[in-house]
Amino acid sequence: MTDYARLQNGSDVRGVALPGVAGEAVTLTPEAAFGIARAFARWLAAKKGVSPQALTVGVGRDSRLSGPAIAAGVMEGLLAEGARCGDCAMASTPAMFMSTVLPGFGWDGAVMVTASHLPWNRNGLKFFTRQGGLENADIRELLAIAGELPAAGAGDTDRRFEAGLMEAYSAHLRGIICQGIGAGEQPLAGIKIAVDAGNGAGGFFARQVLQPLGADISASVLLEPDGHFPGHIPNPEDKAAMASIRQAVIEGGCDLGLIFDTDVDRAGAVDRNGQEFCRNRLIALMSAIV
């Protein structure tokens, strides 16, 4: 029997999803994800005062090696409760939240399969409603529900659909940038921007957001998803990671560098001189702009 409570990590679910690291037994399996997703469907339905069959929930993942199997477990759990399930495939955490409010989507909830910047063998689940991410107490309640669920069979796979979320989310971001700059359809023409996606899910930002707006992204690095994370630790707060984007900017003669973690909810920046802006300095810079 799965000890669901041990998988809580604050407002997320986290665990070891793959073997291969000494002393770290697998704790987050597709079967556990199945049970937790069933619980989320029931929890969300109760909060909204509807049946699980009335729900639409999106599921996305980052580039982790265990992502496809864990995401499949989540979708199967949602389907087992009768919910409609939008398969978002490779996605970012911010995009998964936006799936609950973005025009044309407006889903009831979303699940992101990610362990953020943690090592390759870890994975986890982040949950969203239209009000934002679930909080610690919500996760405790959800995991308690999971521990009491009776067995369930397979759901109706016809209620799973390909979502196309990242295309819509990328268009949304392009619109925000164009509106903010106010310079036509290619406001970034003549600007060279390097993106370091850390082999996570952030390559879309270079190829689907910046490049269509006219930016030169030729100096970008580690855009291809690879759950082994061969380039560096996928964490903008890591010294080796920041050295990677700084090198790309300086050697590429870029105007700006951007670096993301695996699920694209952490970022750092580097200016043309190699000056780093991350954590408090990035917040201070954004505050000055606002």
Report the location of each language-model feature.
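An N-terminal, well-structured beta->alpha segment
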Residues: 1-74, 80, 159-189
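Gly/Ser/Thr-enriched, mixed-charge loops and adjacent short helices
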Residues: 121-249
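N-terminal small/polar loop signature for handling phosphorylated ligands or for N-terminal nucleophile
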Residues: 42, 46, 50, 56-122, ...
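Short, compositionally biased "basic patch" segments
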Residues: 1-22, 132-152, 259-261
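Conserved protein kinase catalytic core
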Residues: 18, 202, 267-269
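Catalytic cores of large soluble enzymes that bind and process phosphate-bearing ligands
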Residues: 5, 25-32, 62, 66, ...
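Well-ordered alpha-helical segments embedded in enzymatic catalytic cores
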Residues: 35-39, 95, 169-172, 241-244, ...
